Amino acid sequence: MSEKHPGPLVVEGKLSDAERMKLESNYLRGTIVEDLNDGLTGGFKGDNFLLIRFHGMYQQDDRDIRAERAAQKLEPRHAMLLRCRLPGGVITTTQWQAIDKFAADNTIYGSIRLTNRQTFQFHGILKKNVKPVHQMLHSVGLDALATANDMNRNVLCTSNPYESQLHAEAYEWAKKISEHLLPRTRAYAEIWLDQEKVATTDEEPILGQTYLPRKFKTTVVIPPQNDIDLHANDMNFVAIAENGKLVGFNLLVGGGLSIEHGNKKTYARTASEFGYLPLEHTLAVAEAVVTTQRDWGNRTDRKNAKTKYTLERVGLETFKAEVERRAGITFEPIRPYEFTGRGDRIGWVKGIDDKWHLTLFIESGRILDYPGRPLKTGLLEIAKIHQGEFRITANQNLIIASVPESQKAKIETLARDHGLMNAVKPQRENSMACVSFPTCPLAMAEAERFLPSFTDKVEAILEKHGIPDEHIVMRVTGCPNGCGRAMLAEIGLVGKAPGRYNLHLGGNRIGSRIPRMYQENITEPDILASLDELIGRWAKEREAGEGFGDFTVRAGIIRPVLDPARDFWE
């Protein structure tokens, strides 16, 4: 569809089964309570398998032992993933100590996983520990509400901007947006926190009785850092400051990376500029975007239900006009803004009020005590003495924020003694993977377990061509749902089958261009052979300051994706 020939505002047809499930769930209650008390299975059955996602959990099993258990006539080893709601990634040291203890005492893997949704996940929670984890979170002022399924997910906010004062203001807006768009149902409190049922009827004035057509992701971003990868998200508020003070936001809508292998109706898409709005209209505009997508999003086909598809179907101007109508405003022209990078600034950075921030590189966000590198113990020891907070970044790293000068040496010593400040090359700092095997049920190929050794080999190629300190934004995602954000990388690997990936090239360093598929269904040796040749050319032929992705486009190695709805698959 073009802007001149927009499609229908509402897609008619038989609703997907997920819509039935939501409608019949009694505002997300289902029969979860009954399932919790069923000791015959380690999992949740029927609709509850999906309903628990609205409560921040996914049912998984250990795929490494799935076949072995099947041979023994045993059900899969079911366990839950829980994702915390943590707007802007800010967590207190008291909260950190509580989650550290829970991970050690009550999860199969004993780890804390930082994610690129700027929060943490527990993997391997047995059914008997599901209620206790929600109660533990509640006891320290946290929850897992609306971190999965068809709601506004965890709201991201730039972690380590150049203006600390601006971060404080932007972070407050991230929290306000998150709270404003939360579901109003009391199901979460009743089921997990044993709060009494109230006689009043549930209402969902913003999300509606069947919630959103699909997942919905929101960011608050402070230029020039695009660390939160705004183009992966449905709704983005780009902070505009005057004299160091936040005055309003540019709004960008309709980003999203998930695709389905071979389904040409799916595509990755960057977000579109709508306009500028003063601060006082922020919540009204956020609500208007969400309710427009609620009413116009495709509820017949979940593969085509995200905001990016709604925007393409009805046309950008039509969607924008509806948001203006609902919010009661007219967007002003976009204010100037520019992004220069999206990696974290590893190491010490000076903030305001003589406070320091220490960004620690955590490979794939996995916090665990490794032989010779007791990362988890180190962070616990820092949490015990640190007077500021921790910030999780959208690059799966951790910031020890607001460290006074008097504590700096002590915290650095703890970090170094526990392997948290080991030297890594720029390539490793700019590489990322989703979890994938063994816990993700959707995984088609390895990602987190594949990345460290693969990065070693890419570093060797950079060294071979005389550019050991260069970096290429590299992402590995275990399936086309794209949690690893490979569709905004300069080198993106998308899992196709065990040991096989689609290789995408042509993204850029700042994350504003979708990469195109260069080779399909290839093995690691084939990938490395291609990269060896292309990185060799980049080292010799690049212009000053030219990133690898920009080089592959300029040199004609790959055609840029300019209009994803039409040319993503070409």
Swiss-Prot record:
Cited InterPro entries: CysI (IPR011786), NiRdtase/SiRdtase_haem-b_fer (IPR005117), Nit/Sulf_reduc_fer-like_dom_sf (IPR036136), NO2/SO3_Rdtase_4Fe4S_dom (IPR006067), NO2/SO3_Rdtase_4Fe4S_prot (IPR045169), NO2/SO3_Rdtase_4Fe4S_sf (IPR045854), NO2/SO3_Rdtase_FeS/sirohaem_BS (IPR006066)
Biological process annotations from GO: cysteine biosynthetic process; hydrogen sulfide biosynthetic process; sulfate assimilation
A Pfam family this chain is assigned to: NIR_SIR
This protein's UniProt keywords: 4Fe-4S, Amino-acid biosynthesis, Cysteine biosynthesis, Heme, Iron, Iron-sulfur, Metal-binding, NADP, Oxidoreductase
Sites where the protein binds siroheme: C483
Cofactor: siroheme; [4Fe-4S] cluster
UniProt cofactor note: Binds 1 siroheme per subunit.
Catalytic activity: hydrogen sulfide + 3 NADP(+) + 3 H2O = sulfite + 3 NADPH + 4 H(+)
Any one of the GO CC terms: sulfite reductase complex (NADPH)
Superkingdom of the source species: Bacteria
Single GO term (MF): heme binding
Gene3D superfamilies: Sulfite Reductase Hemoprotein, domain 1 (3.30.413.10)
EC numbers on record: 1.8.1.2
SUBUNIT field: Alpha(8)-beta(8). The alpha component is a flavoprotein, the beta component is a hemoprotein.
Membership in a protein family: Belongs to the nitrite and sulfite reductase 4Fe-4S domain family.
Function: Component of the sulfite reductase complex that catalyzes the 6-electron reduction of sulfite to sulfide. This is one of several activities required for the biosynthesis of L-cysteine from sulfate.
PANTHER family noted in UniProt: SULFITE REDUCTASE [NADPH] SUBUNIT BETA, SULFITE REDUCTASE [NADPH] SUBUNIT BETA-RELATED
NCBIfam families: CysI (TIGR02041), PRK13504.1 (NF010029)
Record-given protein name: Sulfite reductase [NADPH] hemoprotein beta-component
Lineage, opening ranks: Bacteria, Pseudomonadati, Pseudomonadota, Gammaproteobacteria, Enterobacterales
